[in-house]
Amino acid sequence: MVKLITVIGHGVNLLPHFIEHYQKHVDEINIAVYETELYPNLNEEVTEVIKNYENVNIIIKVQERIFDWEKVTQLYNFVKSKQKNSWYVIADIDEFHLYPNDDLRELIKDCEENSWDIVRGGFIDRIGRGGEFSELKDDVSLWEQFPNAGFFRYPMSKACPNKICVMRGYVDVTAGQHYAKIDDHTTWRWQGWNHPLIAPVKTHSVQVHHFKWDSTSIDRVLNVANINEDYAFSSEYFQMYKELKRTNFKIDLVNPEYMFELGLTKSEFSGYKNWNKLIKKIISL
């Protein structure tokens, strides 16, 4: 059995898209609801959305300070620790995985046969037509609404693009789910290269398509920046907001550093042609 865990801390607009994307890959979708003073009724909102879906459940609800990404990571690790040998997918609500050959179960089968317990991945940033921060529509595929795939957040703000995507329950992840922590060592850079428990990224890596950048994201970036706290990584968000403001809140689709491929309207792993080049870059950062 393969289980997905997601922590929801703001809004439910993406949740139907998220569920429909992952249901074909996993057996269960487990939701941790992270309520804050800004979203005090989030549990009710999530409950309303998921009532018509099978095998989608709220498994824990907490009330914490807003934008504490370290607490979010603690929730992921806490839930996974209950079944240490089980396979888990972890993904934030705006993170949509694409797997090699579009087959998660084949990926996990390879891991079991080779004694790999961790699969890494990296962000591909999605943006609307013309580089715009488009308004999210409920009845149109996300891939069609945000057809442009690239790598702009790291060049703009130096936010870490590494992600730990698939793992057994005993594997802890670090803040932001960017690296695994094994025997008190993280898998950052050389510590993760050729690690015997990590599937080789050249053949077994996950594309994390980041549908963060809709019309509401600019205000959220500013709100996190204004918290001005290390636990919220506010300095990175401030840098991102500053860069977005400088570019008139529009992403340059022809900047070669951003590695854009345009018009990718289907959820296919093979769609983004420069993936091998990009993941090699990501794990070096």
What are the residue ranges of the model-derived segments?
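Catalytic-site signature of metal-activated, phosphate-bearing donor transferases
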Residues: 68-73, 99-285
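Short, high-confidence coil segments that cap the C-terminus of an alpha-helix
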Residues: 26, 84-85, 113-116
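Active-site-proximal specificity loops/subdomain of glycosyltransferases
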Residues: 37-91, 98-99
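Short internal beta-strands
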Residues: 29-35
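Structural beta-sheet core signal
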Residues: 4-6, 31, 118
